Design a protein with these regions (language model features):
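Positively charged n-region of N-terminal signal peptides that target proteins for export
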Residues: 1-5
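C-terminal motif of bacterial Sec signal peptides marking the signal peptidase cleavage site
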Residues: 15-17
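Bacterial signal peptide processing site
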Residues: 19-21
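Thiol-based oxidoreductase modules, predominantly thioredoxin-like and allied folds used
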Residues: 49-52, 88, 92-122
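A short beta-strand-turn-helix
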Residues: 51-69, 99
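Short pre-active-site segment immediately N-terminal to redox-active cysteine/selenocysteine motifs
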Residues: 66-69, 74-78, 135
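Conserved redox-active cysteine motifs that mediate thiol-disulfide chemistry
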Residues: 74-90
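Non-catalytic, surface beta->alpha helical segment in thiol-disulfide oxidoreductase systems
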Residues: 88, 129-175
Length: 177
């Protein structure tokens, strides 16, 4: 009887352990366990309005959602104008609600005191060079293929004014097509 119970439990755990799930994997799980997912193509769950930090992931989301990407080149822990842009615009409910429906958000950070992996530093530096970023904050709007649409930076006036500015930049690009 005991052997049958052990055999049953072993089979049950084997079958349940091998059952695939259709649940998306959280971004944090992939970032915290890169070896676990290194050989797999994983669909990462991204919440609308959430800031991404990986270029390739942002491109994939933009293609899937058919949205432009707002790339924030920032020095989040030392750049005064970056901090102002974050506190006056990016952290406001108006902007967050707008971004959820209209943008993929990508933050490429160049901090002085916040630890980053060497891979992230190199990837961010590569994009900084590609887009000829000379100062912070620089906001670059790109399409789902990564081609620059427009660029801007800090602007006074708060979230509503900034949203209008972004819409103008995106509308001008659509008018050119």
């Amino acid at each position: 009887m005991r052997w049958m119970l052990i055999l049953f439990l072993t089979l049950a755990f084997t079958v349940l352990g091998c059952t695939p799930t259709d649940q998306p994997v959280s971004r944090e799980d992939v970032l915290n366990n890169p070896d676990k997912y290194a050989s797999q193509e994983v669909e990462i769950e991204v919440k609308p309005g959430e800031w991404l930090t990986d270029w390739d992931q942002a491109i994939a989301v933009a293609k899937k959602q058919k949205l432009p990407i707002l790339v924030d080149f920032t020095g989040s822990d030392w750049c005064i104008w970056c901090k102002k842009l974050d506190s006056e615009v990016f952290s406001k409910e108006e902007f967050i609600n707008y971004a959820k429906k209209n943008l993929v958000l990508l933050k490429l950070d160049f901090p002085h005191g916040i630890p980053q992996s060497d891979a992230m530093k190199a990837a961010n530096k590569k994009k900084m060079n590609k887009f000829n970023i000379e100062g912070f904050p620089t906001i670059v709007l790109v399409n789902a293929e990564g081609k620059e649409i427009a660029r801007t930076g800090y602007r006074p006036g708060g979230a509503e004014s900034y949203i209008n500015h972004l819409q103008d930049l995106l509308t001008k690009q659509n008018d050119i097509k």
